[in-house]
A protein has these predicted regions:
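Active-site loop-to-helix "anion-binding N-cap" substructures in soluble metabolic enzymes
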Residues: 1-230
């Protein structure tokens, strides 16, 4: 806990900048607090996973039969507008791997986000999106990562997450990036890519890591912080 406190405090309070954050996962609704807190701190916010579909739909894209929270489109637009007003960059997918059902080794194809079919399901980010994310990370000094880019537990829709994870590990080992990741799905994805040990720090605190990123004070962390005061 002591090590986690020190790492997270440095990353969120006094990071080397530019500071980038990757936020993925299924739903915007579960990470509203996280998105809003990070927008106040980061230089670049990279949005992936199912939650990116809600942002794409909010910006006028058809997302077919993809997971999408249509009741949160106005909220997504507000977040984008807030980011623009604060001079924060939001990075969304520019292409996607789609299929007509979620199944292992189902026939899939890569399409631009403005060409999603009515029966398509977005299941991963495409190669152009992967390269765009990697180019953003190459310019960053610090990264906080919570949530995968695609349906990583079903192959081949883990590839976007794996490629970004490997690039992050390489930047970290080259001394160009401080990389901190956490959350159950994130840790599982990094372990699947066999890169977790190559990140600067991987939190195993699960939900507590998410609450920290949301800006919530955690009792254990508050106690440690108090003990550190002279």
């Amino acid at each position: 806990m002591q090590a986690e406190l020190e790492v997270l405090t440095k990353v969120l309070e006094t990071p080397s900048r530019p500071l980038a954050a990757i936020v993925g996962g299924a739903k915007v609704s579960t990470k509203l607090g996280l998105l809003r807190n990070l927008l106040a701190r980061v230089n670049v916010l990279i949005i992936g996973g199912g939650m990116a579909n809600t942002f794409l739909a909010a910006l006028g894209h058809n997302v077919g039969r993809s997971l999408c929270e249509y009741d949160l489109l106005s909220t997504a637009r507000e977040i984008v507008a807030h980011a623009e007003a604060k001079g924060r960059e939001i990075v969304l997918p520019v292409d996607a791997v789609v299929a007509q059902k979620l199944d292992a080794n189902v026939q899939s194809r890569v399409v631009p986000v403005n060409a999603i079919g009515a029966f398509d399901m977005i299941l991963d980010i495409g190669p152009r999106s992967v390269q765009r994310v990697i180019s953003v990370l190459a310019q960053a000094k610090t990264l906080v990562w919570n949530g995968p880019f695609g349906t990583f537990e079903v192959k081949p829709f883990d590839q976007g997450t794996i490629e970004v994870a490997k690039a992050t590990a390489e930047l970290t080992e080259a001394g160009k990036l401080v990389s901190v990741a956490g959350g159950g799905d994130t840790v599982a994805a990094l372990n699947s890519a066999i890169v977790a040990e190559r990140f600067t720090y991987v939190s195993t605190a699960g939900g507590a890591f998410l609450e920290w990123l949301e800006g919530k004070a955690l009792p254990g962390v508050e106690m440690l912080a108090a003990n550190r005061c002279p």
